[in-house]
């Protein structure tokens, strides 16, 4: 696990984009993408770039259950607004949060991941150490699955909604075992509220109580943090 400290989120996005360009030069074809505030500066760099992404495939980590793709809080909408509308890909995959059978949708998504191995996976990290929507207690062996969101996650995500009551209580998420199959992982974290999770991820025991701790076992993880998020690493 390599730690890169940056001045701010803007610099973090630039570093992540440089890593992506290196990966593309080596033949990467499938990107694993995340939502939330952490990767936005990275997506801004992608949008500003003259690079053409139309031969790439993207696979997103997760989607809320019960939200239409037209909802401005859906992750499908987020990705279109922040990246896909400006930079078309060959194919974009996200879980279908309105699937009639969400368990079957999870299995369908696993098949997509199997057919498109992820070369470059972007991650954020939750205050409780979650990656994707894999909450504390999630089995490291889990693949794509339906998640009951913890109160801390609902509270953290409520800033994007009119009220906390509007935040969905479930999501479909790529599992930890799925994430660990990625050839390269770039995790972005900014702000003091992420410091405890980053410390546990880097130095703590590998435990399902802190899902991101499993990344210690991955061969190629780069963590990009500002000084606030890295404040407990010294």
Swiss-Prot record:
Its EC number is 3.5.99.6. Keywords: Carbohydrate metabolism, Hydrolase. Disulfide bonds: none annotated. Pathway: Amino-sugar metabolism; N-acetylneuraminate degradation; D-fructose 6-phosphate from N-acetylneuraminate: step 5/5. Coiled coil: none annotated. GO terms for molecular function: glucosamine-6-phosphate deaminase activity; identical protein binding. GO terms for biological process: carbohydrate metabolic process; glucosamine catabolic process; N-acetylglucosamine catabolic process; N-acetylneuraminate catabolic process. It is an enzyme of class 3 (hydrolase). The active site is at 62 (proton acceptor), 128 (for ring-opening step), 130 (proton acceptor), 135 (for ring-opening step). It comes from the Bacteria. PROSITE patterns: GLC_GALNAC_ISOMERASE. CDD domains: GlcN6P_deaminase (cd01399). It holds the Pfam family Glucosamine_iso. It catalyses: alpha-D-glucosamine 6-phosphate + H2O = beta-D-fructose 6-phosphate + NH4(+). One of its GO terms (cellular component) is cytoplasm. NCBIfam families: nagB. Catalyzes the reversible isomerization-deamination of glucosamine 6-phosphate (GlcN6P) to form fructose 6-phosphate (Fru6P) and ammonium ion. HAMAP family: GlcN6P_deamin. Belongs to the glucosamine/galactosamine-6-phosphate isomerase family. NagB subfamily. This is Glucosamine-6-phosphate deaminase. It comes from Streptococcus pyogenes serotype M18 (strain MGAS8232).
